[in-house]
Design a protein with these regions (language model features):
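Cell-wall glycan-active module
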Residues: 1-5, 10-12, 16, 21-25, ...
Length: 315
């Protein structure tokens, strides 16, 4: 017999039921306390609710949204944005800058990817020629953008756009997301820049959040059902919500602009480029400038143009 066993028990037997129950209760309490510790401090949505209500949104509707199970504070949205902005401050050597000027994303120029884009172009030729005639934007450019943005509509993002935008809008104060940035990222040299950009991006996200809510109300959609990219871009064409109002096209004339519907998405891409200056005869420099407006990256613009050239059979 185990000399340490309590009277009336065998040391090899399980403890009494009462002890097991006590241990389970203690474990549950410990888990709950740990959960409180790791829960993001920004889970209080009240400041955002107040701001939206002051801007005319129905308070009860907004409060109901933020109390739903799907509503989550996702600090990585703003943290990722600030991290990329700070990293962009690193000086680029002249030799590398010269290479980047003409750089492309090679993964979109493989024979397999170009073949997919060419097949998509053939399958949707009638629609794309209609778009080209209406906006003056070459069909190859439209398909190239679609290939890069969502792999021809196959990957439109699986994040809840509401959460991404609300999380960024909630905290214009850098200190609130600083714990998620890493200890060495913020330095005395970039601190003020990071603070300013955090405020600016929070304001931008708030404007986009309002546009998302207006879009959902207009089209009778559940805001939580709208999925998008890590920063809240939506649909095959990856438009921010405000751009849907500015450049979206109801091409299939069903009474709503649905960027998950092919006709609306492709027309909207071309309309965006057209509204930014694309004409039937536009030189290469202006082509680069206009595509850059769609996605602020020189490499992106270069890649769109390179894919389009391959689709035309010139490269």
């Amino acid at each position: 017999m185990n000399p340490r066993a309590k009277p009336g028990t065998n040391g090899d037997n399980p403890p009494p039921a009462r002890m097991v129950l006590s241990l389970l209760r203690f474990a549950s309490l410990l888990f709950f306390l740990l959960l409180l510790q790791v829960r993001p401090a920004g889970a209080d949505w009240n400041p955002l609710v107040e701001r939206l209500a002051a801007d005319g949104f129905d308070r009860r509707t907004v409060e109901a949204l933020f109390t739903r199970q799907e509503a989550r504070f996702e600090p990585d949205a703003m943290a990722g944005k600030i991290r990329s902005l700070i990293q962009s401050l690193t000086p680029v050597p002249d030799s590398l800058a010269a290479k980047l000027k003409d750089a492309v994303q090679e993964k979109y120029l493989t024979s397999w990817m170009v073949a997919r884009a060419r097949s998509y172009l053939r399958e949707n030729m009638s629609l794309l020629e209609e778009i080209q005639a209406r906006y003056g934007v070459p069909k190859e450019i439209v398909v190239s953008i679609l290939l890069i943005e969502t792999h021809l509509g196959e990957n439109t993002g699986n994040r809840i756009a509401f959460n991404r935008l609300a999380s960024m809008a909630l905290y214009p104060d850098l200190e609130a997301i600083r714990p998620y940035l890493g200890a060495s990222l913020i330095t005395p040299d970039n601190l003020e820049y990071a603070r300013r950009r955090c405020r600016e991006k929070a304001d931008w996200a708030y404007s986009e959040l309002k546009a998302l809510l207006r879009l959902a109300a207009r089209d009778s959609l559940d805001p939580m059902s709208i999925r998008g990219s890590i920063y809240g871009a939506i649909g095959l064409s990856q438009f921010m919500p405000s751009n849907i109002f500015a450049y979206g096209v109801d091409a299939d004339e069903d009474g709503r602009i649905d960027l998950f519907a092919k006709p609306d998405a492709l027309h909207s891409i071309a309309n965006y480029l057209h509204k930014h200056g694309w004409k039937r005869e536009v030189d290469i420099r202006n082509q680069e400038r206009i595509i850059f407006a769609y996605n602020h990256s020189t490499v992106y613009a270069n890649t769109v143009l390179a894919i389009a050239e391959k689709l035309r059979g010139r490269r």
